[in-house]
A protein has these predicted regions:
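Extended, non-globular alpha-helical segments
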Residues: 1-12
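Extracellular cell-wall/glycan-interacting regions and their flexible linkers
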Residues: 1, 48, 52-53, 64-73, ...
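A structural motif
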Residues: 74-95
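Glycine-rich catalytic cores of cysteine/serine-nucleophile enzymes that process amide/ester linkages
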Residues: 10-69, 97-105
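Solvent-exposed, acidic/flexible segments
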Residues: 27-30, 71, 75, 110, ...
Length: 152
């Protein structure tokens, strides 16, 4: 897909009970994150429980966003990573064992929303240390990118 603009978007609404629970548990403003490409496509791991790309009309009342500077390398990485992970399932085990029970376990073939975003963007920017993406929350991703010069 040709990418003209790309944003990391963070779900801030309390529409669903699990959004409130996630925000409370992680002491965060956000319960979910994905990429928003060309102001049209929501890309990432979703409520549908797998990595997908779908047309979506984003509401600024429900989502905050950070626009990234687009370049050829980022465009290639996004397309390549999406192609490799498309259809990968949501990693509920990592959420429960790593974020609730602090067991630091994950399935490398499954992702949480923030894990998928962090791993993809770290291929371009190399800014997450240590590389334990499965331990990150949407708020962690927001904090890293809102404090860097990688945004427009």
């Amino acid at each position: 897909m040709k990418i003209n603009n790309i944003k990391i978007v963070f779900y801030k609404s309390n529409y669903r009970w699990w959004s409130r629970l996630i925000k409370w548990w992680t002491n965060s403003s956000y319960s979910h994150c994905e990429l928003y490409i060309n102001n049209t496509y929501l890309v990432g791991i979703s409520n549908e429980q797998s990595v997908r790309c779908k047309k979506y009309d984003l509401s600024s009342e429900k989502w905050d966003s950070i626009e990234l500077k687009i370049d050829n390398k980022l465009e290639w990485i996004v397309n390549d990573f999406f192609e490799k992970t498309q259809g990968a399932k949501y990693d509920w085990k990592a959420i429960i064992l790593s974020n609730i029970f602090n067991r630091r376990l994950q399935n490398t073939n499954k992702y949480t929303c923030s894990e998928w975003i962090a791993e993809l963007l770290d291929l371009r920017y190399n800014i997450f240390q240590p590389k334990k993406y499965y331990m990150l929350t949407p708020q962690d991703v927001y904090d890293v990118f809102s404090k860097n010069e990688l945004i427009e």
